[in-house]
Amino acid sequence: MKALSKLKAQPGIWMTDVPVPELGHNDVMIKIRKTAICGTDVHIYNWDEWSQKTIPVPMVVGHEYIGEIVAIGQEVKGFNIGDRVSGEGHITCGHCRNCRGGRTHLCRNTIGVGVNRPGCFAEYLVIPAFNAFKIPDNIPDELAAIFDPFGNAVHTALSFDLVGEDVLVSGAGPIGIMAAAICKHVGARHVVITDVNEYRLDLAKKMGVTRAVNVSKENLTDVMKELGMTEGFDVGLEMSGAPPAFRTMLSTMNHGGRIALLGIPPSDMAIDWGQVIFKGLFIKGIYGREMFETWYKMAALIQSGLDLSPIITHQFPIDEFQKGFDIMRSGQSGKVILDWQ
């Protein structure tokens, strides 16, 4: 079958031909319709330090997709041939304390589709049936293909009560923008997003944020005054992994504020811990999606009117995958979809 693989330990990604994956007793085989390029895939393409330590070569990559079940393992129940599905990209062990305690997303033995095992940038993908999620008929393929990153946004944004709260989102990548849109949709008062990328900030405006702030040109405290804010942000969503952004967030949070961290900062990031202690801030780390509560919330949010369509800015047939990666690497895009049909 046709697949996009990391064939060499150097920058790039290559179209290749690989065997169709084998189906296990508890697996489903999915014929891929559409995939989306993740920031992780860009890291793998660029072959940065994280990728060099993490990604086996050669391997099919990719983990954002929508497809149709074409084969079912003999032990599988609850799925049928023809079901339209996406899937949770974190394969968990099922036997550790967190898995057995219902906290599956915290499995210490997690394996990532397209990161530690073959991914979805291929004509067919095999995953455990446990990880498959049926997509409601009224959700189009394009949106279903980005459920994985949308789930990161939902998990992060819905970590805390948002109704009537003022929210700061640092980092206007696709996940940050979707998180900001979720906050507005569920009833936050002011949702302010910060970045230095004008293209992404304009995209955030299309998604309904209160203010999109280019911190290289505007002062965040001036924006807060403009909005009539006197006590700081109630909720912070750190999506950038940029130390200056997190330090600014800490300084502009209200006392008792709550912060969810999805962005991955450098391991030696220095912050003013006095801000955390004397403001009584609560900081929560976010990894992946809660299985499977986040997935049901994703579907329900879209069915209740959350419009994510502006975040999908480019679509290419799979044979033009290089254009997709080039536009993603430029930073001048939202989500990029690759069509396998």
From Swiss-Prot:
Name of the protein in question: L-threonine 3-dehydrogenase
Recorded GO CC terms: cytoplasm
Example of a GO biological process term: L-threonine catabolic process to glycine
A matching Pfam family: ADH_zinc_N
Assembly behavior: Homotetramer.
Keyword Glycoprotein (UniProt): no
NCBIfam families, A to Z: PRK05396.1 (NF003808), tdh (TIGR00692)
Example of a GO MF term: L-threonine 3-dehydrogenase activity
Localisation: Cytoplasm
UniProt enzyme class: oxidoreductase
Function noted in UniProt: Catalyzes the NAD(+)-dependent oxidation of L-threonine to 2-amino-3-ketobutyrate.
Gene that this sequence comes from: tdh
The reaction(s) this protein catalyses: L-threonine + NAD(+) = (2S)-2-amino-3-oxobutanoate + NADH + H(+)
Record pathway: Amino-acid degradation; L-threonine degradation via oxydo-reductase pathway; glycine from L-threonine: step 1/2
Family in the record: Belongs to the zinc-containing alcohol dehydrogenase family.
Keywords: Cytoplasm, Metal-binding, NAD, Oxidoreductase, Zinc
Bound cofactor: record note: Binds 2 Zn(2+) ions per subunit.
Binding residues for Zn(2+) 1: C38, H63, E64
Cofactor entry: Zn(2+)
Domain of life: Bacteria
